[in-house]
């Protein structure tokens, strides 16, 4: 019969009849069950008003509200639902449309008492038809109410539908609170699903409710609603509210919703549900529209096999009756599938679809779709089979329609998809109890795909880049499963291949593939390291790997497709998610979706009927783990997976660690940090372990756990952290086995924990995971550092033990590193507070070996530069590993940590200024951990750090000390700090009085600097020569920027800092090697800096007095402003990080908070003393690092910061510093306008602040030249040091302002870094890099597009200037309005001149605009380099075409053209700088190739040298001009060097040419103004 009834049509097309009674909508025990975590357990009520025949919805005070027509309705108020109203509950992906239509009620349904009552039989006959039509109509409808009459059935159907919707949502992950970032994306999928699902589902709901509508059920099944129904009858009728709902309801619901969303896909999903997670993992593949369904059959699941799976799963689900009812249609579908073997491509496409679309979706969502189990598992294979068969028909038809378009794409990826299906199948197998049929399927699949292993490996590697870790875990579990059963073994192998696609590491990764992966990673913000972790794939899994690779490619291709079919996504989330889809989804979903659905799902999976013992365990546990680690997308769904690629074998981890770095830059720092370190340390071991099959499952698991723990540390890392034992596995077979066992235990525990955590509200899970992640991160780092020592222990250890073992391991690692501070251990305990290298909350015992203590001071000789570099890389990795989730907290922690570190260092120095021995480690860090103190100490710490750095040089390296080490071995810092502190007051007082005093102070400062070598100079320069300090600081800043950039981007509390410290230290050590030449006296300076603590007590009063009181001169006013700004910036870096995190314009942020922070401790610190300045520089470096400033930006920023704070620092000082820094610094410093803007005169300090560009331009060219020229030589540095020392002493007087400026800038940098991390990730990082002068950073972070554009313009100008600086240093210098024009001579002459320019030493403080300019400069330079590279590539291509017919050495040319991939990566955490360097290197190579093409014999070169170059430059197009200019730049302006060449933009090149033609300073400013943010010239004529 039909009756008029109200329906809620979900966006997936599922119609839920609204019973004529009150129904509850929610996640638990509700008639209309929604799977979205954003939906409360009892979310809303839909009541029926019989008098008006209307349904009313009332929100039950839900967290996320109920929305009618996208308007949140008031709580506890009934709102009448009108026709076509759009109803949404929370942020559930199901948008229900209120539809009224006739519903044909099946006779069986009519017989159902409840249904009859509700329907009021008079209308029953037409209800079914109406239902069909309504479901067809309301594809977009997403109503949370289930038909009351069909409450159980409808509820389950709704659950199923909503699951489908939720799957769309859940894969994306709905946040517990707030609108998901992906909101609205699912409806497309839902629409598709609805098309397939709508009719059958409604019938199913109706029939299912009555339980008599077998036909309806069949129809429902056919449309994948049947799949749900099968689940639901099992779940609904037996115990709709009881066990099925609770136990399986969520997964089942998710599955159902998946099915509803993708009915066709859901057919296999029902299989999965019915299969009990086993044989119908293929069903998961079907999660993708029709994929799972076809997958089961296409996966070589004969109907017998399917039946076996179904039979196996029936035990899981008691759906026998339903199964029987559905068997007819299901069998028909299955038979049809078996006979016709609908193209695997169909379900593969579905899988691919789910991959691409659902790749962002959490695995468990995919699983839900595929499984169609409210409980997360389809209990019966039969059900799965029946659902599959029933829904497979519709699904296949739907998919045929849907995927014929996809088919073409999928055909390419078909083999991959098959492999993915295998992976999915194995995943399903893991989930389900049917290992054998699944194994067969997997085997068949793995055998079927004959995709070339290289391509598959490449694709696989791509996917395993993000996939690797999780597949590793899954493979571990799968290996376990292999042990469990032979078929399981096959599945495991397949799963390993699928999940373990990452298992095989491409021995010869395609450079193109790698590049493509990099590009993809970049696109998804995951591109930190160019070395992507490539999965170490077992030979036996190569096929699967191929499949996975193909599927990855398919997933990538389909990523843009709406993943209407999430069935495969489900299984792929389990297995394939581990694979290609994961890597895609990890990035895409990480980028877009950062929710915890995956956690939820994983928990569901853990709680799923199948324990963790089989593939299910692997799929659930392993998948969860892998999901956590490998399937970043899963993580993003479950817990907003950290943007950490799945943990590959450690060998690959190291590669992937870089990728993970990128990912983690957006991800939590700590998580990635640890992972990358671990990966670094144990990649080979992991690889070997992967190769060992016996150990492989566990080792993979461990690795996966480890990698995941590291990677997704914030996700469900506690469990994953057991994976930290992966290094242990890598250590040795024995350790591996032990670790495997322990890890297995730990994994089980973790899984339990995860289940608990996941079952707990998402927020709770997030918190748990976050805490765990931090711990795990730290622990993992230790483990990675010391995999042999702690692995087994760590495996055994669960969360705490892992932490402990990691503490020990970290300690050992620290010992090994000799840079990792004791803080590493504490890092675990106090995740947010502890800095690994910088300090530990707990005060270190004097007993702690110096090696363990990060050297606050630059360990010039303490730690080998290689160690330092290793630490730096580790630190960088670690920082990159930090999870984005914890990035906010981490950023704040990082800033606090930096502040604390500064305070501690200041305190340490204070404590150790008398005793400069290694006792420093025992200094009371706790006392110095005052946030406010930090702010003050932030700057002061550098000063204190000067002393303590030496003392703790080998004990601890703090950012400050590292920074100091870099800036000056740290001794100078102390000395300078001391002199600065005294000189600070004096300066404040004497600044106005006389520069002579400054000169005298500078002389003293120089003495310190000289005595301490170059190291001290930077410290002194902090006060006097911001740039001088900036150079070392820049070096450190670069290092730290590099490290801390990551850290700040992924603030990991102290850990990132520690890592950054270590990293900086390592970098500094590298720099120290260069600086060492200049600063052999570092230790000597230590004693000198004993005085440094003195300013500490007076810092606040002194700085404030200096800022506001005695030194209230105009210069002091500048200093005051600078100090205020610096203060603000320091505060910003320390306290303001949240501000930086805000999306407020950086400019706004910097502007607002600075004023707010005028009285902040930072200002005091800044004005307090040179020490503070040193600290400020250090902090700036930290801030830069935090802000993700790259090496170059750091230097640039630091100098600029210094310029702002201490504009007086002479360029020669900066040059010297640059030279001292060496080529590394040079690269950083080529952009360091600070040298340029570091005017020599105090007037310049004020005036150049306004016109710093010119000054910078003048100075910068020489300085940059010096840097470039003396990069390799320390001699110019020594001479420069003398000058700088003098200048510094003058500058020390102005140090207060400068230091305040520095502090402010560092604060800004921190803010910007935060903003970058939060908002732009990589791009912001670039800005951050350019933002080293924290203003820009803060501004960039805070500034909206317009502000950023302005900044970009600034940057462009700065960038152009930087190019110009190098090109026309003399002109610029001669044009310097200051009396320091003499400096405009040669870089070295300038270096010599600085002494003459003590006035110059009083650099004009750069205005915030200028600082921004630097930030923008870095950003713009980065963009320019990119543009230049692109244009050069284009030009090279064009030239190649032009000259292809000519006789050329094309092999050589092509190799040159491809050489960019071979460009050595500069060790810099600044993605911007490294990217710029890479781009410029590529440009250089391309230009070389172009040169070879154009002028193979050098005739043109000769002509050009004879005088045609001027004609050549203008003649070629801008792109070519840039190349030409770049090409000739070596001859024309060697000082420009690579950085300039890279920076050379077409416009910039022309500008550079003009500058080379001795353009006037006015021209510089014109160029600055002329260049748009793009670097394009606004007015070419102006340039002309």
Swiss-Prot record:
Instruction: Name positions with the PTM Phosphoserine.
Output: 138, 141, 356, 359, 446, 466, 497, 571, 580, 630, 633, 636, 667, 725, 838, 879, 881, 930, 933, 958, 1019, 1059, 1112, 1114, 1132-1133, 1145, 1160, 1165, 1198, 1205, 1210, 1239, 1241, 1251, 1270, 1280, 1362, 1521-1522
Q: Can you list the GO cellular component terms from the UniProt entry?
A: centriolar subdistal appendage; centriole; centrosome; ciliary basal body; cytosol; microtubule; spindle
List the biased-composition ranges (Basic residues): 401-411
PTM per UniProt?
Phosphorylated; probably by PLK1.
Q: What residues bear Phosphothreonine in this entry?
A: 501, 644, 760, 914, 920, 1023, 1058
Give the Phosphotyrosine positions (modified residues): 364
Q: Where is the composition biased (Low complexity)?
A: 860-873, 971-982, 1073-1103, 1122-1138
User: What is one Pfam family matched by this protein?
Assistant: CEP170_C
List where this protein forms a coiled coil.
Answer: 1467-1495
Start and end residues of each stretch annotated as Targeting to centrosomes: 1113-1584
Q: Domain (FHA): give its ranges.
A: 23-73
Write out the annotated subcellular location.
Cytoplasm, Cytoskeleton, Microtubule organizing center, Centrosome; Cytoplasm, Cytoskeleton, Microtubule organizing center, Centrosome, Centriole; Cytoplasm, Cytoskeleton, Spindle
Map out region (Targeting to microtubules) in residue numbers: 853-1584
Q: Which UniProt keywords apply?
A: Coiled coil, Cytoplasm, Cytoskeleton, Microtubule, Phosphoprotein
InterPro entries xrefs = Cent_Immune-Sig_Mod (IPR051176), CEP170_C (IPR029300), FHA_dom (IPR000253), SMAD_FHA_dom_sf (IPR008984)
Which PANTHER family does the record match to this protein? CENTROSOMAL PROTEIN OF 170 KDA (PTHR15715:SF17)
Which family does the UniProt entry place this protein in? Answer: Belongs to the CEP170 family.
Q: What role does it play?
A: Plays a role in microtubule organization. Required for centriole subdistal appendage assembly.
Q: How does this chain assemble?
A: Interacts with CCDC68 and CCDC120; leading to recruitment to centrosomes. Interacts with PLK1. Interacts with NIN. Interacts with FHDC1. Interacts with CCDC61. Interacts with TBK1; efficient complex formation may be dependent on the presence of CCDC61.
This protein is called what? Centrosomal protein of 170 kDa
What organism does the UniProt record list as the source? Answer: Homo sapiens (Human)
């Amino acid at each position: 019969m039909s009756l008029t009834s109200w329906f809620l049509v979900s966006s997936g097309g599922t119609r839920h009849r609204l019973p004529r009674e009150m129904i509850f909508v929610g996640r638990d025990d509700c008639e209309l069950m929604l799977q979205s975590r954003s939906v409360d357990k009892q979310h809303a009520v839909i009541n029926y008003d019989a008098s008006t025949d209307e349904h009313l919805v009332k929100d039950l005070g839900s967290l996320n509200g109920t929305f009618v027509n996208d308007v949140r309705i008031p709580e506890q108020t009934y709102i009448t639902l009108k026709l076509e109203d759009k109803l949404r509950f929370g942020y559930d992906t199901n948008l229900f449309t209120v539809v009224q239509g006739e519903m044909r009620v099946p006779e069986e349904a009519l017989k159902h008492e409840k249904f009859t009552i509700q329907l009021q039989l008079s209308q029953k006959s037409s209800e079914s038809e109406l239902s069909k039509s309504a479901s067809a109509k309301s594809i977009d409808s997403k109503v949370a109410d289930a038909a009351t009459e069909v409450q159980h059935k409808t509820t389950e159907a709704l659950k199923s539908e909503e699951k489908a919707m939720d799957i769309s949502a859940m894969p994306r992950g709905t946040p517990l609170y707030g609108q998901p970032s992906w909101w609205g994306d699912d409806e497309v999928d839902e629409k598709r699903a609805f098309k397939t699902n709508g009719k059958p589902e409604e019938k199913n709901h109706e029939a299912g409710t009555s339980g008599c509508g077998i036909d309806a059920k069949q129809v429902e099944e056919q449309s994948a609603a049947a799949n749900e129904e099968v689940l639901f009858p099992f779940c609904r009728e037996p115990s709709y509210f009881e066990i099925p709902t609770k136990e399986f309801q969520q997964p089942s619901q998710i599955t159902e919703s998946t099915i509803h969303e993708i009915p066709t896909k859901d057919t296999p999903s029902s299989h999965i549900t019915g299969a009990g997670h086993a044989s119908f993992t293929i069903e998961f593949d079907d999660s993708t529209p029709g994929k799972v369904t076809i997958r089961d059959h296409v996966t070589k699941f004969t109907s017998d096999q399917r039946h076996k799976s179904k039979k196996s799963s029936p035990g899981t689900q008691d759906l026998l009756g339903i199964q029987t009812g559905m068997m007819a249609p299901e069998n028909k579908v299955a038979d049809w599938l078996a006979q016709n073997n609908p193209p695997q491509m169909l379900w593969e496409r579905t899988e691919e679809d789910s991959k691409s679309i659902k790749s962002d979706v959490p695995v468990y969502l995919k699983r839900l779709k595929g499984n169609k189990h409210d409980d997360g598992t389809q209990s019966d294979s039969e059900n799965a089979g029946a659902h599959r068969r029933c829904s497979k028909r519709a699904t296949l038809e739907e998919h045929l329609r849907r995927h014929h378009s996809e088919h073409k794409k999928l055909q390419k990826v078909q083999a991959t998809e098959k492999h993915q299906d295998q992976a999915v199948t194995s995943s399903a197998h893991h989930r389900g109890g049917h290992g054998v049929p699944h194994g067969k399927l997997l085997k068949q699949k793995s055998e079927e795909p004959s995709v070339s292993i290289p391509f598959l490996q490449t694709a696989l590697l791509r996917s395993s880049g993000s996939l690797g870790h999780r597949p590793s875990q899954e493979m571990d579990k799968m290996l376990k499963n292999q042990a469990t059963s032979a078929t399981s073994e096959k599945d495991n192998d397949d799963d390993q291949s699928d999940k373990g696609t990452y298992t095989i590491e491409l021995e010869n990764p395609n450079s193109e593939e790698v590049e493509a992966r990099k590009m993809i990673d970049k696109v998804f913000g995951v591109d930190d390291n160019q070395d992507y972790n490539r999965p170490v794939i077992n030979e036996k899994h190569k096929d699967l790997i191929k499949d996975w690779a193909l599927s990855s490619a398919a997933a990538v291709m389909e990523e843009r497709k709406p993943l209407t079919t999430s069935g495969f996504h489900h299984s792929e989330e389990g297995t394939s998610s581990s694979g290609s889809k994961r890597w895609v989804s990890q990035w895409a979903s990480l980028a877009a979706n950062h929710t915890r659905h995956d956690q939820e799902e994983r928990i569901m999976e853990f709680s799923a009927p199948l324990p963790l013992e089989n593939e299910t365990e692997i799929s659930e546990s392993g998948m969860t783990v892998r999901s956590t680690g490998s399937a970043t997308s899963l993580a993003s769904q479950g817990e907003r997976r950290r943007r950490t690629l799945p943990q590959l074998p450690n060998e690959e981890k190291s590669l992937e660690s870089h990728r993970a770095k990128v990912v983690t830059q957006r991800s939590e720092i700590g998580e990635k940090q640890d992972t990358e370190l671990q990966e670094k340390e144990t990649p080979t071991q992991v690889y070997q372990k992967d190769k060992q099959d016996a150990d492989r499952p566990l080792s993979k698991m461990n690795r996966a756990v480890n990698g995941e723990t590291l990677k997704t540390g914030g996700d469900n890392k506690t469990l994953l952290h057991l994976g930290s034992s992966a290094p242990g596995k890598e250590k040795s077979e024995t350790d591996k086995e032990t670790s495997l066992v322990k890890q297995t235990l730990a994994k089980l525990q973790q899984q339990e924990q995860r289940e608990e955590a996941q079952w707990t509200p998402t927020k709770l899970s997030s918190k748990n995971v976050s805490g765990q992640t931090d711990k795990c991160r730290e622990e993992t780092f230790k483990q990675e550092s010391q995999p042999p020592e702690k692995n087994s222990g760590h495996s055994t250890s669960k969360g705490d033990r892992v932490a402990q073992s990691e503490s020990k391991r970290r300690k050992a690692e620290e010992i090994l590193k000799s840079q990792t501070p004791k803080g590493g251990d504490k890092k675990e305990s106090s995740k947010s507070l502890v800095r690994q290298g910088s300090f530990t909350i707990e005060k270190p015992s004097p007993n702690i070996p110096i090696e363990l203590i990060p050297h606050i001071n630059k360990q010039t000789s303490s730690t080998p530069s290689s160690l330092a570099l290793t630490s730096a890389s580790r630190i960088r990795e670690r920082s990159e590993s930090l999870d984005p989730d914890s990035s906010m907290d981490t950023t704040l922690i990082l800033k606090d940590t930096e502040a604390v570190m500064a305070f501690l260092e200041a305190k340490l120095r204070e404590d150790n200024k008398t005793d400069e021995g290694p006792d420093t480690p025992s200094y009371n860090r706790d006392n110095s951990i005052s946030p406010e103190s930090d702010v003050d100490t932030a700057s002061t710490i550098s000063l204190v750090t000067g002393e303590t750095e030496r003392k703790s040089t080998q004990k601890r390296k703090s950012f400050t000390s590292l920074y100091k080490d870099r800036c000056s071995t740290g001794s100078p810092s102390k000395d300078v700090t001391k002199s600065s502190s005294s000189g600070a007051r004096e300066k404040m007082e004497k600044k106005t009085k006389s520069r002579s005093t400054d000169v005298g102070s500078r002389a003293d400062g120089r003495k310190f600097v000289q005595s301490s070598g170059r190291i001290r100079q930077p410290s002194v320069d902090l006060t006097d020569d911001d740039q001088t300090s900036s150079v070392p600081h820049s070096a450190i800043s670069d290092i730290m920027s590099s490290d801390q950039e990551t850290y700040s981007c992924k603030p990991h509390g102290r850990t990132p800092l520690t890592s950054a410290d270590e990293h900086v230290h390592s970098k500094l050590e590298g720099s120290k090697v260069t600086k060492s030449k200049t600063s052999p006296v570092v230790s000597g300076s230590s004693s000198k800096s004993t005085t440094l603590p003195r300013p500490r007590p007076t810092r606040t009063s002194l700085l404030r007095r200096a800022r506001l009181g005695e030194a209230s001169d105009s210069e002091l006013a500048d200093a005051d402003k600078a100090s205020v700004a610096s203060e603000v910036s320091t505060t910003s870096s320390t306290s303001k990080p949240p501000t930086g995190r805000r999306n407020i314009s950086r400019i706004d942020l910097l502007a607002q908070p600075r004023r707010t922070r005028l009285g902040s401790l930072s200002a005091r610190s800044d004005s307090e003393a040179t020490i503070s300045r040193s600290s400020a520089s250090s902090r700036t470096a930290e801030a830069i690092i935090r802000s993700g400033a790259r090496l170059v930006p750091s230097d640039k920023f630091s100098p600029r910061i210094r310029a702002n704070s201490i504009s007086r620092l002479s360029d020669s000082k900066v040059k010297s510093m640059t030279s001292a820094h060496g080529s590394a610094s040079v690269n950083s410093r080529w952009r360091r306008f600070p040298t340029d803007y570091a005017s020599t005169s105090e007037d310049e300090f004020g005036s150049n602040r306004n016109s710093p560009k010119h000054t910078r331009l003048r100075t910068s060219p020489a300085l940059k030249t010096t840097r470039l020229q003396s990069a390799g030589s320390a001699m110019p540095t020594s001479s420069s040091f003398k000058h700088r020392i003098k200048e510094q002493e003058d500058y020390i007087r102005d140090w207060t302002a400068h230091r305040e400026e520095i502090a402010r800038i560092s604060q800004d940098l921190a803010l910007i870094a935060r903003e970058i991390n939060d908002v732009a990730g990589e791009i912001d990082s670039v800005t951050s890099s350019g933002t080293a002068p924290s203003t820009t950073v803060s501004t960039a972070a805070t500034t909206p597009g317009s502000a950023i554009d302005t900044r970009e313009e600034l940057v462009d100008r700065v960038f152009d200037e930087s190019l110009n600086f190098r090109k026309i240093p003399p002109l610029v210098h001669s044009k310097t309005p200051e009396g320091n024009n003499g400096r405009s001579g040669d870089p070295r002459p300038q270096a010599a001149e600085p002494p003459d320019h003590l006035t110059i030493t009083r650099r004009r403080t750069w205005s915030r605009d200028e600082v921004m300019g630097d930030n923008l400069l870095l950003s713009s330079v980065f963009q320019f380099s990119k543009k230049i590279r692109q244009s050069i590539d284009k030009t090279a291509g064009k030239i190649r075409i032009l000259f292809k017919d000519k006789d050329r050495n094309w092999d050589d040319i092509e190799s040159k053209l491809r050489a960019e991939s071979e460009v050595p990566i500069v060790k810099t955490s600044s993605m911007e700088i490294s990217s710029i360097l890479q781009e410029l290197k590529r440009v250089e190579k391309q230009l070389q190739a172009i040169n070879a093409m154009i002028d193979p014999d050098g005739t043109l070169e000769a002509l050009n040298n004879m005088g045609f170059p001027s004609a050549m430059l203008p003649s070629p197009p801008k792109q070519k001009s840039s190349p030409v200019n770049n090409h000739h730049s070596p001859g024309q302006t060697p000082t420009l060097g690579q950085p300039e060449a890279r920076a050379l933009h077409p416009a910039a090149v022309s500008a550079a040419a003009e500058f080379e033609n001795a353009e006037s300073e006015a021209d510089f400013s014109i160029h600055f103004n002329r260049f748009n943010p793009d670097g394009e010239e606004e007015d070419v004529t102006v340039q002309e």
